[in-house]
Swiss-Prot record:
InterPro entries (alphabetical): HRD1_E3_ubiq-ligases (IPR050731), Znf_RING (IPR001841), Znf_RING/FYVE/PHD (IPR013083)
Start and end residues of each stretch annotated as HAF-H domain: 474-529
Record's subcellular location: Endoplasmic reticulum membrane
Name of the molecule in the record: E3 ubiquitin-protein ligase synoviolin
Keywords recorded for this protein, A-Z: Developmental protein, Endoplasmic reticulum, Membrane, Metal-binding, Phosphoprotein, Transferase, Transmembrane, Transmembrane helix, Ubl conjugation, Ubl conjugation pathway, Zinc, Zinc-finger
Reaction catalysed by this enzyme: S-ubiquitinyl-[E2 ubiquitin-conjugating enzyme]-L-cysteine + [acceptor protein]-L-lysine = [E2 ubiquitin-conjugating enzyme]-L-cysteine + N(6)-ubiquitinyl-[acceptor protein]-L-lysine
Example GO biological process: protein stabilization
Residue spans crossing the bilayer: 5-25, 42-62, 99-119, 141-161, 170-190, 225-245
Organism: Mus musculus
Ligand binding (Zn(2+) 2): C307, H309, C326, C329
Post-translational modification (record): Auto-ubiquitinated. Deubiquitinated by USP19.
Location of region: Interaction with p53/TP53: 236-270
Biased composition (Pro residues): 341-375, 393-409, 435-449, 560-570
Pfam families named in the record: zf-RING_2
Length: 612
């Protein structure tokens, strides 16, 4: 306060000195005025004195219409004034050809009236937070709104007639500025009426928030239209109004916020009426039954939010007009009620097992897959797995006296039913008889959660997948820059973490692809083949010996025939039974004999000369 008084006294003394010096030089009134207006230093001193007088006038009018200004009102006034001064300086650059003392005075008056519009808006908003409003407050606000409305209308009318008579000039800017101030006065007046009606009623007015929301929506739409028309006219008749960019952006943002609030509030109120249950008397007794919005006890008509906080229905309706969060925990009620609106997705188990497109061959149980080697994977974990239903249980192993028969597949090597398999050591094991019961069929490998292999799905080409990244050995292999790139909450840190997850996903896909290839190769191998000798004559002789059925074990091995001589046939040897011969001579389904059948025919040709 003391600094302000010193500055005003210094400005007054400097102005008196300049006027006295000019009068001392000219000795007459009119030449003194001409000298002051033509001298730049004298005009600068006079401008400073004019600003001081405007400041004093503002102080006086503030005391009359507002009394003591609150700290929040002063803060808002200073914050908006700095932006207004900056926009005024930009307007001076746009209208530099019209720069004159009258032009500066008009902009100063516009800034002066804007300050009172802002103070009136803050003071009317204070009515909602103040329980006691005196009659002096009503008289001040009503008289100020009446005065501001009259001044705005007069300046708009003056600018309109000036544009009609003199054409487009700087009055175009003042006309639109005062028109926007008129919409502000209209908004202040509607809010004042709504607050006054609410103060007169004993109970809180539930529909006040609705009217205020639609009032802001209506006046915001008018402001956006005015700014768009002003920008269009200024660009067409003068130049681009750079000083109007910020207020136009603020008006558009405020209008967008009003539209969003209207939509979200209606959605929140609809959810409150349809989704949120009414609070029971037991729930009200279990918690503090005081509504934190209105500070009154809740007896009936209370709603329970998804966060289990309870409020009055009318209080929640008024609260949701402004924000869609819980008044206590600030939980987003729209996001919390989103899963309740959408039905849950059906479980994959309800769909049942998918139908098998083609009969798939069964794999023999490999000995190198112990039980529980691989744990079952959760469904949908890897994109390469096809959807599958429940898997059949693994059949029990065959008894010690029975041998599992290999499945007759096209990929596995088939053997005759009555033939015995000869091992590398020379011992032979007899196969089951044709009339015997076959052993249990082999199922999927134990420990695998899928029936291998994918016979109906072709393998993708190896170049269809992205190159596999090299997995790091640990954090010790990362540089400090790479570690810092993974830490933090900024965008580059999130992108680094997402890239790491993509690398992990690629490695898992590559591992599943290799498992798929391994199982496909394993399915095509079939049962293990016996070890064969290098000499073809010995192989032929061993096959002949194994092909002859015997009821008792031989005491000694059959002699190996020399090359070129046919082997002797024992007297007790008999031709095979017709049933077994018929079974042996059966061909596969495709009509072509396999390797075992061809070998049997060659043996028959070798035996035919000896038999005769």
């Amino acid at each position: 306060m003391f600094r302000t008084a010193v500055m005003m006294a210094a400005s007054l003394a400097l102005t008196g000195a300049v006027v006295a010096h000019a009068y001392y030089l000219k000795h007459q009134f009119y030449p003194t005025v001409v000298y002051l207006t033509k001298s730049s230093p004298s005009m600068a001193v006079l401008y400073i004195q004019a600003f001081v007088l405007v400041f004093l006038l503002g102080k006086v009018m503030g005391k009359v219409f507002f009394g003591q200004l609150r700290a929040a009102e002063m803060e808002h006034l200073l914050e908006r004034s700095w932006y207004a001064v900056t926009e005024t300086c930009l307007a001076f650059t746009v209208f530099r050809d019209d720069f004159s003392p009258r032009f500066v005075a008009l902009f100063t008056l516009l800034l002066f009236l804007k300050c009172f519009h802002w103070l009136a808006e803050d003071r009317v908003d204070f009515m909602e937070r103040s329980p006691n409003i005196s009659w002096l407050f009503h008289c001040r606000i009503v008289s100020l709104m009446f005065l501001l409305g009259i001044l705005d209308f007069l300046f708009v009318s003056h600018a309109y007639h000036s544009i009609l008579t003199r054409g487009a000039s700087v009055q175009l800017v003042f006309g639109f500025e005062y028109a926007i101030l008129m919409t502000m006065v209209l908004t202040i007046f509607i809010k004042y009426v709504l607050h006054s009606v609410d103060l007169q009623s004993e109970n809180p007015w539930d529909n006040k928030a609705v009217y205020m929301l639609y009032t802001e929506l209506f006046t915001g739409f008018i402001k956006v239209l005015l700014y768009m028309a002003f920008m269009t006219i200024m660009i067409k008749v003068h130049t681009f109004p750079l000083f109007a960019i910020r207020p136009m952006y603020l008006a558009m943002r405020q209008f967008k916020k009003a539209v969003t609030d209207a939509i979200m509030s209606r959605r929140a109120i609809r959810n409150m009426n349809t989704l949120y249950p009414d609070a029971t008397p037991e729930e009200l007794q279990a918690v503090d039954n005081v509504c934190i919005i209105c500070r009154e006890e809740m007896v009936t008509g209370a709603k329970r939010l998804p966060c289990n906080h309870i409020f009055h229905t009318s209080c929640l309706r008024s609260w949701f007009q402004r924000q869609q969060t819980c008044p206590t925990c600030r939980m987003d009620v729209l996001r919390a009620s989103l899963p309740a609106q959408s039905p849950p997705p059906p479980e994959p188990a309800d769909q049942g097992p998918p139908p098998a497109p083609h009969p798939q061959p069964l794999l023999p149980q490999p000995p190198n897959f112990p039980q529980g080697l691989l744990p079952p994977f959760p469904p949908g974990m890897f994109p390469l797995w096809p959807p599958m239903g429940p898997f059949p249980p693994v059949p029990p192993p065959p008894s010690s006296g029975e041998a599992a028969a290999p499945p007759p597949t096209s990929t596995a090597v088939s053997r005759p039913s009555g033939a015995a398999t000869t091992t590398a050591a020379g011992t032979s094991t007899s196969a089951p008889a044709p009339g015997s019961v076959p052993g249990p069929e082999a199922g999927p490998a134990p420990g695998f959660p899928f029936p291998p292999p994918w016979m109906g799905m072709p393998l993708p080409p190896p170049f269809a997948f992205p190159p596999m990244p090299v997995p790091p050995a640990g954090f010790a292999g990362l540089t400090p820059e790479e570690l810092r790139a993974l830490e933090g909450h900024e965008r580059q840190h999130l992108e680094a973490r997402l890239q790491s997850l993509r690398n992990i996903h690629t490695l898992l896909d590559a591992a599943m692809l290799q498992i798929n290839q391994y199982l496909t190769v394993l399915a095509s191998l079939g049962p293990p083949r016996p070890a064969t000798s290098v000499n073809p004559t010995e192989e032929t002789a061993s096959t002949v010996v194994s092909a002859a059925p015997s009821t008792s074990a031989p005491s000694s091995e059959a002699p190996t025939p020399s090359p070129g001589a046919s082997p002797p046939i024992p007297e007790a040897e008999k031709p095979p039974a017709p049933e077994s011969v018929g079974i042996v001579e059966e061909l596969p389904e495709d009509g072509e004999p396999d390797a075992a059948e061809l070998r049997r025919r060659r043996l028959q040709k070798l035996e035919s000369p000896v038999a005769h």
